[in-house]
């Protein structure tokens, strides 16, 4: 194995010196880079962790995650609820769950509005999201700003490929909340929201945007994702080798051995702690607090006001101040832990 590792390292240049664009592998270093002329195009890669403060569970947390709370649906295993083969035979569990998680019942979080600020300041190249809650759209991102890698509730289609009739979000919502399994008006087969189930291909837009975006990205900001689901997880390796990557998450993730990653076709993983680390920064903690800390360092004082204003608008439109109370601006932890879990060994080794 060591022989192969050395051979591939030399052949693929895995051990060669890379250009370092961050003067410090901390959130402060990322901030200074974002304020420089070198950083003009930012891609955000986001997962369920950016929506948990809105009251939407993530998938894999041991006690609070979605997979840990599906016993009432009597599934053969938790992931079956999102498998297309199981859905076609037993759609009822999915639609029961969909009623609980349906878009429109939750407000965007601080993370969502931070991404909107990136757009307003001309920095956002694209937001790639694994989420199907549509909160990026509610926060103000346009379809062209987004790659909804795992699909969306905005449209639905008949699962009968010879039919394929399209249905609107309002049509699907009416069916779900009437507790009726949505059936095609044309052929009576089940109608499924256009979210990507296990066993289905990702939308073509995912691959077309991936080809055009990552060759020119200046910074990756990765938030609230375990980076365990392919091919989304492989996006971290699509950026140029010099491009800095900031992870805002509860734990470090995406750390794949470069040699094994290349052998498996996943690309090089993230490196936060080794002596060769040169572009990856991890901020560990609540995603909203991480965005607040970064916004503070950037001088973007308007973030919290934006969240309050937009939440008030949503409440006014819904006619209820009680809707989604968990999504209000979370209390700031003082001071913002701007350096928390950024590569702390840096000064010891230099």
UniProtKB/Swiss-Prot annotation:
It is found in: Nucleus; Cytoplasm, Perinuclear region; Cytoplasm; Cytoplasm, Cytoskeleton. The modification Phosphoserine is found at residues 16, 63, 170, 330, 334. Residues 315-331 have a biased composition (Polar residues). One of its GO terms (biological process) is lipid catabolic process. It catalyses: N(6)-acetyl-L-lysyl-[protein] + NAD(+) + H2O = 2''-O-acetyl-ADP-D-ribose + nicotinamide + L-lysyl-[protein]; N(6)-tetradecanoyl-L-lysyl-[protein] + NAD(+) + H2O = 2''-O-tetradecanoyl-ADP-D-ribose + nicotinamide + L-lysyl-[protein]; N(6)-hexadecanoyl-L-lysyl-[protein] + NAD(+) + H2O = 2''-O-hexadecanoyl-ADP-D-ribose + nicotinamide + L-lysyl-[protein]. CDD domains: SIRT1. The active site is at residue 150. Binds 1 zinc ion per subunit. Induction: In oligodendrocytes during differentiation of CG-4 cells. Residues 340-350 have a biased composition (Basic and acidic residues). A motif (Nuclear export signal) lies at residues 4-14. Residues 20-301 form the Deacetylase sirtuin-type domain. Its EC number is 2.3.1.286, 2.3.1.-. Residues 312-350 are annotated as: Disordered. Interacts with CDC20, FOXO3 and FZR1. Associates with microtubules in primary cortical mature neurons. Homotrimer. Interacts (via both phosphorylated, unphosphorylated, active or inactive forms) with HDAC6; the interaction is necessary for the complex to interact with alpha-tubulin, suggesting that these proteins belong to a large complex that deacetylates the cytoskeleton. Interacts with FOXO1; the interaction is disrupted upon serum-starvation or oxidative stress, leading to increased level of acetylated FOXO1 and induction of autophagy. This is NAD-dependent protein deacetylase sirtuin-2. It comes from Rattus norvegicus (Rat). The lineage of its organism: Eukaryota, Metazoa, Chordata, Craniata, Vertebrata. The gene is Sirt2.
